[in-house]
Amino acid sequence: MSRFWNRRVRDLHPYVPGEQPKVADLLKLNTNESPHGPSPKVLAAIRDAASDDLRLYPDPTAAVLRDTIAARFGTTSDRVFVGNGSDEVLAHAFRALFHDDAPVLFSDVTYGFYPVYCGLFEQPFRHIPLNDDFAIDIDAYTGDCGGIIIANPNANTGIALPLEQIETLLKRHPDRTVIIDEAYVDFGAQSAIELTHRYDNLLVVQTLSKSYALAGLRVGFAIGSPELIEGLIRVKDSFNSYPLSRPAQAGAIAAIQDTDWLADITARVIASRDRLVPELQNLGFQVLPSCANFVLVHHPAHKAGAIAAALRERAILVRNLSTPRIQDWLRISIGTYEACIRLTDALRDILSPRS
């Protein structure tokens, strides 16, 4: 605690990211990164952008990237906002679109950045408990609120909501912004982007970090009504007018355009997930149904922390989260076929009875 910190900083509870240790032969299954590399077209575009033009500022409006996203998702560029990763996009959305005269609503088990944003921007919030089966209870999202954010598929559980339930929320709260955070949507859920033309209170946020295999590039985007997008732009231009570098914009354009690569690597992740789930169940784990690039698992006979520690001794990282309802669960990112074999072999050894 420093005497130089202001009150707001003293009261912050910052987000804690998954660890990124430098260990030889490390198998990282803790931060939901892609096990496959980005499109070769992306790498070529980034190399081409690394020219003498780096002496110049990038386009502050990222016009070509926004046009590319608009074309890809059947909308117009005035409905598209881009930022330095979806975390920045979400932060701007909390600041611009959520009101502080009533609590922001989100699940008790979800992305850990949501309460951090509320703390930073001094917005009240209320956790809405998941059902006993860890599904989002739409009927509980009632009453006055400052806005609503739903991760779909839900962060940490991987369970997805159907679009008709999202529509229920939009109709119930027509004068409040509803944000659907679709970081994992490409792994088996249905995007709500098609609803943005019918509901002016809907903002859909996606990232290139997961399914596009570009966590290191830091690009995210939002799609919504022009008035929502203008609110985000006002906040961006009051904070950082140039959030995306020239290489980032070039790489993101190539990634959005290479739909074949996206389809291939997401299909491979889904296939690995479908193989891993029964293997984990055969080892005694309860596995929640996942539409994401991870699974949330619980073993009734073994503590999650002990399993995570034993895996770490074998240079395998998984995430043992501190959220109260899932503190005895493990979130395991989906790796390659070979990575999943290494994981299950290690778990089999850890869980086997010792004589």
Curated annotation (Swiss-Prot):
Q: What Gene Ontology terms describe what this protein does at the molecular function level?
A: histidinol-phosphate transaminase activity; pyridoxal phosphate binding
**Enzyme Commission no:** 2.6.1.9
Q: Which reaction does it catalyse?
A: L-histidinol phosphate + 2-oxoglutarate = 3-(imidazol-4-yl)-2-oxopropyl phosphate + L-glutamate
Example of a GO biological process term: L-histidine biosynthetic process
State its cofactor. pyridoxal 5'-phosphate
Uppermost EC category: transferase
Residue positions of the PTM N6-(pyridoxal phosphate)lysine?
K210
Q: Which PROSITE patterns match?
A: AA_TRANSFER_CLASS_2
Q: Per UniProt, what is one Pfam family of this protein?
A: Aminotran_1_2
Q: Which InterPro entries match?
A: Aminotrans_II_pyridoxalP_BS, Aminotransferase_I/II_large, HisP_aminotrans, HistidinolP_aminotransfase, PyrdxlP-dep_Trfase, PyrdxlP-dep_Trfase_major, PyrdxlP-dep_Trfase_small
Look up the record and name the pathway of this protein: Amino-acid biosynthesis; L-histidine biosynthesis; L-histidine from 5-phospho-alpha-D-ribose 1-diphosphate: step 7/9
Alphabetized, the UniProt keywords read: Amino-acid biosynthesis, Aminotransferase, Histidine biosynthesis, Pyridoxal phosphate, Transferase
- Check the record and name the PANTHER family matching this protein: HISTIDINOL-PHOSPHATE AMINOTRANSFERASE (PTHR43643:SF3), HISTIDINOL-PHOSPHATE AMINOTRANSFERASE 2 (PTHR43643)
Indicate the family of this protein: Belongs to the class-II pyridoxal-phosphate-dependent aminotransferase family. Histidinol-phosphate aminotransferase subfamily.
Assembly, per entry: Homodimer.
Question: What name goes with this protein?
Answer: Histidinol-phosphate aminotransferase 2
Q: Which organism is it from?
A: Gluconobacter oxydans (strain 621H) (Gluconobacter suboxydans)
